[in-house]
């Protein structure tokens, strides 16, 4: 059977040919665990589950990695509001998320890395980006310099003005360019953080997936997946971080296919109002 997958990178359906016929490797961006999973999270998990099941009918070995983001501003805020240690909060909601996915008959990933277990790899990646001239440190922050990556916008197809308007990143005075984004930021007491060459701080969200996907799967791998809402800025920034370290800046140095599921339409103001764990078990 010929398997075709819509590749966001090219905007077309392409015949799927793995990097290595004997081992297909897939990375999916997983949840940020500060609350119950909502139906939007489930939508993405079900789409990934379908993809993995199809791949496993065609190839002998498929490794499926999906991360857990367990350090994030939303997590810090939730832990503060609940007066609960961050580790306890994220462990609890990771367990509930996995239980919810199992209830939906969604297979858990072969590898489920937690961001906080890979801070060393993130610091190493930042160091490489600084040494290559793609990142810079200012006022305790380390930022990726977007103009240094010649193919920025290759995934989202956004022009320069759209990139800045849609980045959802505050234009801070220490940025060299308005589109530059955070790789590392300081953590003032009592915020959580780690020691680094740039002071006590924590990683930016985009950096986490670049570091964890390379650590768990190696480069290049076959498919990077997520919801359409992650195309920009998250996945665009992942490509920039990873591929700027290669001389030709080719996105194929990272992942060959980018698989994105559509957003789920829901009548509530937010899909977060329909959390899976609040639904009756008989549903």
Where are these regions (language model features)?
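General alpha-helical segment detector with a strong preference for membrane-spanning helices
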Residues: 42, 71, 210-212, 274-277
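N-terminal, positively charged nucleic-acid-binding surface of large information/translation enzymes
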Residues: 10-13, 19-105
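Residue-level detector of short coil/turn "hinge" positions at structural boundaries
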Residues: 61-62, 86, 108, 136, ...
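Short, solvent-exposed turn/loop segments enriched in Gly/Ser/Thr/Pro and often Arg
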Residues: 64-72, 114-116, 231, 258
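Alpha-helical recognition segments enriched in aromatics with Gly/Pro capping
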Residues: 1-34, 49, 99, 120-268, ...
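Positively charged, low-complexity/disordered segments
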Residues: 271-273, 277-283
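Non-catalytic interaction-recognition regions
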Residues: 56-58, 84-85, 94, 98-124, ...
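Conserved beta-strand segments of alpha/beta enzyme cores
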Residues: 4, 61-63, 111
């Amino acid at each position: 059977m010929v398997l075709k997958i819509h590749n966001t990178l090219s905007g077309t359906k392409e015949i799927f040919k793995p990097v290595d016929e004997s081992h297909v490797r897939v990375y999916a961006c997983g949840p940020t665990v500060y609350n119950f999973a909502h139906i939007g999270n489930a939508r993405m998990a079900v789409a990934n589950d379908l993809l993995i099941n199809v791949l496993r009918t065609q190839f002998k070995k498929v490794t499926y990695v999906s991360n857990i983001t367990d350090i994030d501003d939303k997590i810090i805020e939730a832990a503060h509001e609940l007066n609960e240690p961050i580790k306890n909060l994220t462990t609890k909601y990771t367990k509930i998320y996995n239980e919810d996915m199992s209830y939906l008959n969604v297979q858990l990933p072969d590898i489920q890395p937690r961001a906080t277990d890979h801070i060393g790899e993130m610091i190493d990646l930042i160091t490489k980006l600084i040494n290559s001239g793609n990142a810079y440190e200012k006022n305790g922050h380390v930022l990726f310099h977007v103009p240094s990556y010649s193919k920025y916008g290759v995934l989202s197809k956004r022009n320069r003005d759209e990139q800045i308007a849609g980045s959802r990143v505050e234009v801070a005075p220490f940025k060299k360019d308005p589109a530059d984004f955070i790789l590392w930021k300081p953590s003032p007491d009592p915020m959580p953080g780690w020691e680094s060459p740039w002071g006590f701080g924590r990683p930016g969200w985009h950096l986490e997936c670049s570091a964890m996907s390379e650590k768990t799967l190696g480069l290049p791998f076959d498919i990077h997946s997520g919801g359409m809402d992650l195309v920009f800025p998250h996945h665009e920034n992942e490509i920039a971080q990873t591929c700027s370290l290669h001389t030709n800046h080719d996105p194929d140095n990272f992942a060959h296919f980018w698989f994105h599921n559509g957003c789920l339409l829901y009548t509530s103001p937010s899909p977060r109002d329909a959390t899976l764990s609040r639904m009756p078990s008989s549903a």
